């Protein structure tokens, strides 16, 4: 779904890359993918995944996502993946600093009701267009959801 919505040559940031499923999938269209994770074992396996899949446009980063705006300084990204369902919304302010004009952010979250994180999103991106999709049931009272956030030109 994300790959089909991408344009050729996008710069992508995966804030919580793990072993790299999103970077591997998106590398065919992206100009550059910065794949970050705080877990050294995950980054080691990400590097291995990059080698095994012959990916030349994926840059692995070992770091805390809270520090990414400082670490990546003036870089801006066309697409940001935030797949940390228990806590990704807590990193929206950092994502706002890294989003290019017109960027799309994919925020994965566990929710109990529709629109649960809209206020958090609108605090970081006041004029964003938000589309929420429920992916699957997580427990009897919660859902795994994705918020597709179209930033617009406000950044």
Predicted regions and their residues:
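Rossmann-like S-adenosyl-L-methionine
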Residues: 1-155
């Amino acid at each position: 779904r994300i790959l089909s919505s991408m344009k050729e040559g996008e710069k992508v940031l995966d804030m919580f890359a793990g072993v790299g499923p999103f970077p591997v999938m998106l590398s065919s269209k992206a100009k550059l993918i910065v794949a970050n994770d705080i877990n050294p074992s995950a980054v080691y396996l990400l590097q291995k995944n990059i080698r095994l899949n012959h990916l030349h446009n994926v840059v692995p980063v070992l770091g805390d996502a809270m520090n990414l705006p400082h670490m990546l300084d003036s870089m801006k990204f066309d697409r940001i993946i935030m797949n940390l369902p228990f806590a990704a919304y807590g990193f929206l302010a950092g994502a706002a600093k890294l989003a290019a004009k017109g960027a799309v952010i994919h925020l994965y979250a566990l929710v109990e009701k529709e629109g649960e994180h809209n206020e958090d999103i609108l605090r970081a991106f006041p004029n964003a267009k938000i589309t929420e999709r429920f992916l699957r049931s997580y427990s009897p009272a919660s859902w795994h959801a994705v918020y597709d956030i179209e930033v617009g030109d406000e950044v």
